[in-house]
Amino acid sequence: MGWLEIISVRTTKAAQNAALLELCRKLRAPWTQGPSPDLKFYCSVGYDTDLSVHIHWQAAVTLDGPSAFGLEVRSLLSDFGLISHTLWREPEPTL
């Protein structure tokens, strides 16, 4: 089973997105505290001020709340604007 943390930020100005994307590129550095997650970044189609970071954890990781890495990412992005941080899991297969 996989887990997905989605951290979205809404900036006050679209001009901040360049700095925000540069910061996100630095997030790709290896995570040294446990299994390394897969990271993907998305820009909103409808709003130039919205960016979303998707952190995908493999089945070996069990989360009951935001991960330490997710909390670190959220903290870094909070300087840019309003934050939404949600946790999703894949549904368990039925028999």
Segments from the language model and where they lie:
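Short coil/turn motifs at secondary-structure junctions
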Residues: 12-14, 58-60, 92-95
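Glycine-rich beta-strand-turn "strand-cap" elements at beta-sheet edges
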Residues: 37-52, 72-95
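Secondary-structure boundary/capping motif
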Residues: 8-12, 84-86
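Short amphipathic alpha-helical segments
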Residues: 13-38, 68-76
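Short, well-ordered beta-strand segments in beta-rich or mixed alpha/beta enzyme
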Residues: 4-9, 40-66
